[in-house]
């Protein structure tokens, strides 16, 4: 038997034991085909052909996958061919299979390669995106002016079947927005992997990647919130310096976020909710969606009744003051008449 036949025999005997998660599909002179699997979404099919002058020349390698990025696979195939040159004159097949398996183990973020590429395009110069392959997480920092939000995004091993998680969050936005970033990010991630309670269609639910969904939300929020205006007074909600932002959640100038996403000062929101029109519920001046807020639980009928009562009270006070003014004027006139009469005597 020749060199290639000996190597093929060695591959067929040792592949399963030497390369973890491998399945030998074919092992003949025309092609060696091996499927290497760590998870359902981290599977690479290695297709190997022998060159004419093998083993004096490197193997011809093609990588395939149903879930991983084509661009990633093309780049890895080039690296594999360079790796083959280290073993010229020797058996190369098992060495390359072990190299591919090692690449999968050491780069757990390969399952979100395309998402990471998309995220990088949305970031600006002051933003940061750091890949930490060893810990299967991404360090994200988004900034607008002096405001920032940074967090560690953990990517689970069975991603995208399981969703990403936000950890170690830090920001200089007021506490209200920190809670919003984390809660909404968690909810968006959950929706990507859990079916809705009320299905709109009969189609089976399929989990979708959550990294880009969560990150895009965080980037958009941090970039736009410092430039938002109060929907009532139209003044900037957040001051240019985060240190001057109101953090007392009962203060008049504290920022309140509606479910539609628009912002109000607390004082402006209360004033707006207490004044007509009330029919059909109070609506956001910008998007016309009905306003729901945890600090305002009155129905439109009760709010209208209270407003009418306040107006009636105001009219009563005005009438009382007017009567008092008339009586006071009459008394003053009577005193003037008495004084004039005395002087005349």
Identify what each model region corresponds to:
Residues 1-34, 54-140, 159-229:
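Glycine-centered motif in EGF-like
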């Amino acid at each position: 038997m020749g060199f290639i036949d000996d190597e093929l025999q060695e591959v067929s005997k040792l592949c399963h034991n030497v390369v973890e998660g491998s399945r030998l599909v074919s092992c003949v002179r025309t092609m060696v085909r091996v499927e290497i699997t760590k998870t359902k979404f981290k599977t690479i099919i290695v297709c190997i052909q022998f060159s004419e002058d093998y083993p004096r020349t490197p193997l011809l390698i093609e990588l395939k996958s149903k879930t991983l990025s084509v661009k990633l696979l093309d780049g890895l195939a080039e690296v594999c061919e360079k790796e083959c040159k280290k073993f010229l004159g020797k058996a190369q097949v098992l060495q390359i299979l072990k190299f591919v398996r090692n690449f999968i183990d050491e780069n757990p973020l390969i399952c979100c390669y395309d998402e990471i590429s998309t995220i990088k395009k949305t970031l600006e110069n002051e933003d940061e995106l750091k890949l930490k392959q060893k810990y299967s997480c991404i360090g994200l920092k988004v900034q607008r002016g002096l405001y920032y939000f940074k967090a560690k995004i953990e990517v689970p091993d069975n991603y995208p079947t399981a969703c990403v998680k936000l950890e170690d969050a830090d920001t200089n936005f007021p506490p209200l927005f920190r809670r919003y970033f984390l809660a909404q990010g968690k909810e968006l991630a959950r929706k990507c992997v859990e079916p809705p309670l009320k299905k709109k269609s009969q189609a089976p639910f399929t989990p979708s990647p959550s990294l880009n969904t969560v990150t895009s939300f965080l980037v958009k929020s941090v970039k736009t919130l410092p430039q938002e205006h109060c929907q009532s007074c139209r003044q900037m909600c957040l001051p240019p310096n985060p240190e001057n932002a109101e953090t007392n959640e009962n203060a008049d100038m504290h920022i309140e976020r509606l479910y539609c996403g628009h912002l109000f000062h607390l004082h402006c929101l209360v004033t707006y909710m207490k004044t007509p029109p009330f029919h059909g519920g109070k609506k956001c001046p910008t998007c016309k969606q009905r306003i729901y807020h945890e600090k305002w639980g009155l129905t439109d009928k009760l709010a209208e009744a209270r407003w009418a009562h306040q107006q009636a009270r105001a009219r009563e006070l005005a009438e009382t003051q007017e009567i008092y003014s008339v009586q006071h004027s009459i008394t003053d006139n009577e005193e003037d008449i008495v004084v004039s009469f005395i002087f005349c005597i």
